[in-house]
Amino acid sequence: MRPSKRAADEMRTISFERGVSKHAEGSCLVKFGDTHVLCTASLEEKVPGWMRNTGKGWVTAEYGMLPRSTGERMRREAAAGKQGGRTQEIQRLIGRSLRAVVDMQALGEMQITVDCDVIQADGGTRTAAITGGWVALHECLRWMEARQMVRVEKVLKDHVAAISCGIYEGVPVLDLDYAEDSVAETDSNFVMTGKGGIVEIQGTAEGVPFSEEEFGALMKLARSGIDRLVSLQKMAVA
């Protein structure tokens, strides 16, 4: 039995709230159960130096956790003077995931930065950030379209979403919360597009290796979860 009493293939309650930031061109507060992430998409009408005069745009991401997003206060990374390795890994993952569904040529020489700030963490912060980050990006592009800068459907080629799966007490389960994630025998994250394309898979065994059959079960769970997330994204931006 899962600590949350959920079925093996049952996700937490997922919600997207758009337009939560007064200043950002696009924003979304995404909730995966008790994991809450504020995603904002900010437009700059310029690109990094290495992309100038290419006619292409760029999408990048930053990620951070508020000090009391966890059970005990975390020291701000800014106070430490540098980002931790985990933070850098996650924000690169978010950026890669979003770029996988963006036509940079159609975006033109502009950059969109998606900031993902974890307000409350209960497992799956990176998957929530990717999924909510797509909604914030969509809202930014919609803002641009209203000003005749781009066409959303030309720039954003597909949905992208992410979900965690793992093996908890010998059973493959979908969308792990912290109580499961912290003791799972296997923990994995799947990033996929709305059309079913695989963007990234991260999978780790904790002590006991997992089999190809178990991986197949996790993949099946992930696909069902991504399908549901994409449906929720569609409703959120409709």
Swiss-Prot record:
EC number(s) from the headed UniProt entry: 2.7.7.56
In its UniProt record, a GO molecular function of this protein is: tRNA nucleotidyltransferase activity
Keywords on record: Nucleotidyltransferase, RNA-binding, rRNA processing, Transferase, tRNA processing, tRNA-binding
Which residues participate in phosphate binding? R86, G124, T125, R126
Which Gene3D superfamilies does this one have?
GHMP Kinase, N-terminal domain (3.30.230.70)
Q: Does the keyword Magnesium apply?
A: no
InterPro entries referenced in this protein's UniProt entry, alphabetically: ExoRNase_PH_dom1 (IPR001247), ExoRNase_PH_dom2 (IPR015847), ExoRNase_PH_dom2_sf (IPR036345), PNPase/RNase_PH_dom_sf (IPR027408), Ribosomal_Su5_D2-typ_SF (IPR020568), RNase_PH (IPR050080), RNase_PH_bac-type (IPR002381), RNase_PH_CS (IPR018336)
Q: Which Pfam families match?
A: RNase_PH (PF01138), RNase_PH_C (PF03725)
Which reaction(s) does the protein catalyse, per the Swiss-Prot or TrEMBL entry?
Answer: tRNA(n+1) + phosphate = tRNA(n) + a ribonucleoside 5'-diphosphate
Q: Which biological process terms from the Gene Ontology are attached to this UniProt entry?
A: rRNA catabolic process; rRNA processing; tRNA processing
Cell membrane listed as a keyword: no
Q: Which PANTHER family match?
A: EXOSOME COMPLEX COMPONENT (PTHR11953), EXOSOME COMPLEX COMPONENT RRP41 (PTHR11953:SF0)
Its biological purpose is as follows:
Phosphorolytic 3'-5' exoribonuclease that plays an important role in tRNA 3'-end maturation. Removes nucleotide residues following the 3'-CCA terminus of tRNAs; can also add nucleotides to the ends of RNA molecules by using nucleoside diphosphates as substrates, but this may not be physiologically important. Probably plays a role in initiation of 16S rRNA degradation (leading to ribosome degradation) during starvation.
How it assembles, according to the record, is: Homohexameric ring arranged as a trimer of dimers.
* Similarity comment text for this entry: Belongs to the RNase PH family.
Q: What is this protein's name?
A: Ribonuclease PH
Originating species:
Brucella melitensis biotype 2 (strain ATCC 23457)
